[in-house]
Amino acid sequence: MVNRLYTLILSILLSISAIASTQPRLTIVVIVDGMTQDNLTAMRPYWSAGGLRLMSEEAFQTTATFPHQVYGGQETTATLMTGTIPAHHGIMADHYFSRSERKPIPILHDKQASGIGTHIQLSPRDILSTTVTDEWRMLRGTQAQIYAIGLQPEATILMAGHAANACCWLDAETHKWVTTSFYPEGLPAAADEMNMSGRIDLLAEREWTPRMDISMYNHPTDKERKRGFTYFNKEHLLHTPVANTLVIEMALALQQSKQLGIDMQPDLLLLQLTTLSPQSASDAIESAEQEDMYMGLNQDLGFLIEQLNRRIGKEQYQIMVIGRPVKGYSTATLEMANLPVQRFNADRAAALTGTYLMAIYGHERWVDGGHGPFIYLNRI
């Protein structure tokens, strides 16, 4: 079995004000699920216009490697936001196995928090380290405004940290902006207004098809070559270009309503976007629909930059875009390279470990259970 330590890529640092003589009034951190440097290089011919053209104009790029395995969950988001590893920040996956309830529980589950517009109860209370937003608050004080907008609840809360004014994410079931009661502001008024406006439903009802002839894509699958691809956004909303569009529109609505970046107190806005399509089996581009996701991302970032330039001025803000690994390489890609591929079964591993420990230490339930890539012993 190949045990790869993925490189966590801070793949693009887009400094809009190249080396600004004054401190930017607004900093925007954009985490893009599945975005990699290799994909950006492959897609470069498409960047004659749009936000990602800044790669070759005003961007500084760097990479960072974190010494822990990537399991496809939000442990990487937590590492990015805290600057430390799961052993210290406490977020090792999306779920953990509860010894008391004997079942998987969302890693950020909090019975003290209520969902606003959603039934799930989540909060950042179990993040053990300070996050970027926490440090920002301690450094800038209460006058700084901090918001996070995302596609998944765990990612959005991890970006918001303990100290944000508010956060909101797009609920996969209701197609509404929702949040947690943990943050003092609750659901931002701009999010509630978009929920009521019908804008989300309007975009969700649209059909997603290739934006150009399928022969012009570099990586169409055999199926796509024959029939292209078609998705109804409502069914796969969080994995279509519309999801990114809605996050960008929400960000701009929030910037306008809260006047982010207008006064001299630096504000912080964090966004989660994605390049992963409904059929993505890998972070690497393996289909036309994944290429189309990158084209949509480029367009949405371009719109964000255009609007911010008009509203607050190019020198008054900066954007950092970070690629977050999620799926790594697909099984087919690894096998193509003649690498041995096996799958870890947590339940089987837990059973075998329990049998082994009983043979050594006596008949007792030494293993409580397993979930994901982890097994849980009966004591810490």
Regions found by a protein language model. Give the residues of each.
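Secreted, luminal/periplasmic, and some membrane-associated catalytic domains
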Residues: 32, 94-121, 129, 162, ...
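A long, amphipathic alpha-helix that forms part
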Residues: 39, 47, 237-263, 269, ...
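Short, structured active-site-proximal loop/turn typified by the sulfatase FGly-forming signature C/S-X-P-X-R
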Residues: 40-89, 145-149
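His/Asp/Glu-rich, glycine-adjacent segments
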Residues: 84-85, 90-265, 274-281
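Bacterial N-terminal signal peptides
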Residues: 6-17
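Loop/turn elements at helix/coil->beta-strand transitions in domains of secreted/extracellular proteins
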Residues: 23-28, 58-62, 88, 141-146, ...
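Mature N-terminal segment immediately following signal peptide/propeptide cleavage
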Residues: 21-43, 53, 61
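Second-shell loop/turn segments in exported
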Residues: 36-42, 65-67, 118-124, 235-241, ...
